[in-house]
Structure formats: C-alpha cells, structure tokens
C-alpha cells in the first residue's frame, strides 16, 4: 500500500452517475422512498454542473434506460416530476432524511425538487 506505484481505480463518470440517479427517480416516481437520490442529483449538479456535458449525460441516460428496460417519453418524465413535487409523502420523507443527515442543513424539499426538475428539463428534455 505504501509502495511507489500507481493503482488504477475504475469509476463511473459524473454523467453516468447522474443518469442512473435520474432514471431511478423517474422509474420509481412517488413510490421512491430514497429521497437520497434527489439530494445526490442536487449535490452533483450544484458542485459539478459546469463540468457536465449535455450529450454525454443524454447518452448515459438513454443507455441506462435501455439497460434497465425502462423507456420514458418526455410526457412521462414531466408527469412523474409533477406527481413527485406535489406528493406530501415525499415531502415527509425529505423531512426525515433532513433530520437524520446533518449535511443537508435547512435545504427545503421544494428547492431540491425544483432544482432536479430544472436539471432534467435542461439536460434530458
């Protein structure tokens, strides 16, 4: 471990990570109990948004959907986002997530879901 050599570590690029999170958000809709996915999209885009390449993210999203056998139309995505943003249970889950994860701070559910929705519109629709 302390040798003088290089160790290669293979990781996903940011676009693939985002694509998988976004696909999960859309696929699960209001049945998604993992509001962490929303926080992850929010955080990644907040920190690395300028580095995200739209065509790479779009292709990664398409490949993720194909691999998971879940194809969505623009209308599907918009309808799901509307349902999620209006769902009171999702807001409650966010409150629980917020209380148990100090790093979330006072970040409100509405801010997160609006940000995620705008990100999807900008990059995928």
Predicted features and spans:
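Structured mid-to-C-terminal alpha-helical surface segments
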Residues: 1-125
